[in-house]
Design a protein with these regions (language model features):
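Structured alpha/beta reader/binder surfaces that contact nucleic acids or chromatin modification marks
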Residues: 4-102
């Protein structure tokens, strides 16, 4: 399962249901991480409609709080109130459904 670490502010907003997207820079590092799960389409800029579970972890320790979210991914811009820089392109993980919490 793909695991992404996020800051507490964003983790809490996602957990409360307020934040519905998570952003990652469009860089080779994330291309390599996303392709095995979402396929080549995400690199080519197409929205991947297939839903995949992603573990969002608040910290690097395996015991850190985490949630499993069902997500789709696309390339696009994000919302500044959710941490995105205006006009910058990101891999946008759209959170479709919240799963279990650890």
């Amino acid at each position: 399962m793909l695991t992404l670490t996020i800051k507490k502010k964003w983790f809490d907003m996602i957990l409360s249901g307020e934040k519905k997207e998570e952003y990652r820079d469009c860089k080779p590092y994330y291309q390599k991480r996303f392709c095995p799960y979402f396929g080549r389409e995400v690199v080519d800029g197409k929205k991947v409609r297939q839903v995949f579970p992603v573990r969002l972890r608040n910290g690097y320790d395996v015991r850190s709080p985490s949630i499993i979210a069902k997500c789709t991914v696309r390339r696009g811009t994000g919302k500044p109130e959710w941490g995105a820089e205006p006009g910058k392109e990101y891999y946008v993980l759209d959170i479709i459904e919240m799963g279990s919490e650890k």
